[in-house]
């Protein structure tokens, strides 16, 4: 089933990611009543010579930067750091990059008016200090209580986002607190710093340990402070003395509608090189499908990436997904369930700019009514063959179940509860160093032709497809998503689609 684990030394292993879905490929490309339009904005806490990367001094600045898009009907659907800035990764220039995904409904030819009851919200970002220590149960309970309390006031949860207290300390490897002259020097040389990470001695390496060695060398010249070092357990998201945690909402002026939020299981197996996480294993659909089929939306995730200094390094990571249930008065709240797509994406960073990402795929799926609700960045890093930094991201999309579509049958067994023995039976798939050369994306704007990739069909270095007798994808045909062979996916057996991109 699926791609399985693939040999890292395979010279032709150049897959930029995988796709998992609760649907057959023809159903994925079935047109729905509505489609979406997306805008992807990149922000940085550093100066950048690229005008498309927006400079901010704080996460809070994003609110004013997206106001014009809200006037045009867009809303923020997801916000996330480009890489997961844990451990020495805080010193990477890419740790200062943030992605904001905005969406709005695109009316189909069948409909000439927006759905009734649609209201225009405003973006709100609030600091969210945690009073309890960042342990799974305590943090989950406290965070869920906070966002449920806000939801009663017409605040629709978007996600959590963290920012280092001293961004220049982590983005550039130095601390310029109170030193204006040094700060200006950092702003002037930020692009040079970005290039040095990509054009240094590690250019062309795909070794995780090589990346960590460079980080360790660069950061070793700075003294480590007790409880404030990059490797300290205090750098956990939400609790860190060197991090601020923010909560992002879409706020509505009235509280006539409400949402409720609950947690769900998130457990991942990991492999490490020393203390560094090099691969992650998780069956995303096994963990989430039950909630999707109940009509819930996966909004965000909260993972405890780091352990206290001196503690045993675990072989699994725990956290939780945050799911949203729409209350009365919300348009579309009567729908019975959601189908899902999960994408394991290698995102490539050239200098301080994103070169390859999930944008082209997102614009393609938008035409078929797929809504991006969450992106989980991971600490898994590598260099591609060109020496650019690549990081693994997990992208979650959903669409209401099309009960009346003749092309779709309901998956009866995929909604089983993930608890007890079912949880232990979850099949894991490697999403770590399973590729060597991620393929470059086109523009982050909708491409003229964006093609999905086939299951177990992986790109060769010559750009050809190596067929492994599974379903189709990235093609040159008129259809963006080629049809699957009928016998290769049995929804009644609860088998999920897997695609190598």
Swiss-Prot record:
It comes from Pongo abelii. A lipid is attached at residue 2 (N-myristoyl glycine). Belongs to the raftlin family. PANTHER family: RAFTLIN-2 (PTHR17601:SF1), RAFTLIN-RELATED (PTHR17601). Upon bacterial lipopolysaccharide stimulation, mediates clathrin-dependent internalization of TLR4 in dendritic cells, resulting in activation of TICAM1-mediated signaling and subsequent IFNB1 production. May regulate B-cell antigen receptor mediated-signaling. A lipid is attached at residue 3 (S-palmitoyl cysteine). InterPro entries: Raftlin (IPR028169). This is Raftlin-2. Residues 224-233, 427-440 have a biased composition (Polar residues). The modification Phosphoserine is found at residues 405, 430. Keywords: Cell membrane, Lipoprotein, Membrane, Myristate, Palmitate, Phosphoprotein. The modification Phosphothreonine is found at residue 409. Pfam families: Raftlin (PF15250). It is found in: Cell membrane.
């Amino acid at each position: 089933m699926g791609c399985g684990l693939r040999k890292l030394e395979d010279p032709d292993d150049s897959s930029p990611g995988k796709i998992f879905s609760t649907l057959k490929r023809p159903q994925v490309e079935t047109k729905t009543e509505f489609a979406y339009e997306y805008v992807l904005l990149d922000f940085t806490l550093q100066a950048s010579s690229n005008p498309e990367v927006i400079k901010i001094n704080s996460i809070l600045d994003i609110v004013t930067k997206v106001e014009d898009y809200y006037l045009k009907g867009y809303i923020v659907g997801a916000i996330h750091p480009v890489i997961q800035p844990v451990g020495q990764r805080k010193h990477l220039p890419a740790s200062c990059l943030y992605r904001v995904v905005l969406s709005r409904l695109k009316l189909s030819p069948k409909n000439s008016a927006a759905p009734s009851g649609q209201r225009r919200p405003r973006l709100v970002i609030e600091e969210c200090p945690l009073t309890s220590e960042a342990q799974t149960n305590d943090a989950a309970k406290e965070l869920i209580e906070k966002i449920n309390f806000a939801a009663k006031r017409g605040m629709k949860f978007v996600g959590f986002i963290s920012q280092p207290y001293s961004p220049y300390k982590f983005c550039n490897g130095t601390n310029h607190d109170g030193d204006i002259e040094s700060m200006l020097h950092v702003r002037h040389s930020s692009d040079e710093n970005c290039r040095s990470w990509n054009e240094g001695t590690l250019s062309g390496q795909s070794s995780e340990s090589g990346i960590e060695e460079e980080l360790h060398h660069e950061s070793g010249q700075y003294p480590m402070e007790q409880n404030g070092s990059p490797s300290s357990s205090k750098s956990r998201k939400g609790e860190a003395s060197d991090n601020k945690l923010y909560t992002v909402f879409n706020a509505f002026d009235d509280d006539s509608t409400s949402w409720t939020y609950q947690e769900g299981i998130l457990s991942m197996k990991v492999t490490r090189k020393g203390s560094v996480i090099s691969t992650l294993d998780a069956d995303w659909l096994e963990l989430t499908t039950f909630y999707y089929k109940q009509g819930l939306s996966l909004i965000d995730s909260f993972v405890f990436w780091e352990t206290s200094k001196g503690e045993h390094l675990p072989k699994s990571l725990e956290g939780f997904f945050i799911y949203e249930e729409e209350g009365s008065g919300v348009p579309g709240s009567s729908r019975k369930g959601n189908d899902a797509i999960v994408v394991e994406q290698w995102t490539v960073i050239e200098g301080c700019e994103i070169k390859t990402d999930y944008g082209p795929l997102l614009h393609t799926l938008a035409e078929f009514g797929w809504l991006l609700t969450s992106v989980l960045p991971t600490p898994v890093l590598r260099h591609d063959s060109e020496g650019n930094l690549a990081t693994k991201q997990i992208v979650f999309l959903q669409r209401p179940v099309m009960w009346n579509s003749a092309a779709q049958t309901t998956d009866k067994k995929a909604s089983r509860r993930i608890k007890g023995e079912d949880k232990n039976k979850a099949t894991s798939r490697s999403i770590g160093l399973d590729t060597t050369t991620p393929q470059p994306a086109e523009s982050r704007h909708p491409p003229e032709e964006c093609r999905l990739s086939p299951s177990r069909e992986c790109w060769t270095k010559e750009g050809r497809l190596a067929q492994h007798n599974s379903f189709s994808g990235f093609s040159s045909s008129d259809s963006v998503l080629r049809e699957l062979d009928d016998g290769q996916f049995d929804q009644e057996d609860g088998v999920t689609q897997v695609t190598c991109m």
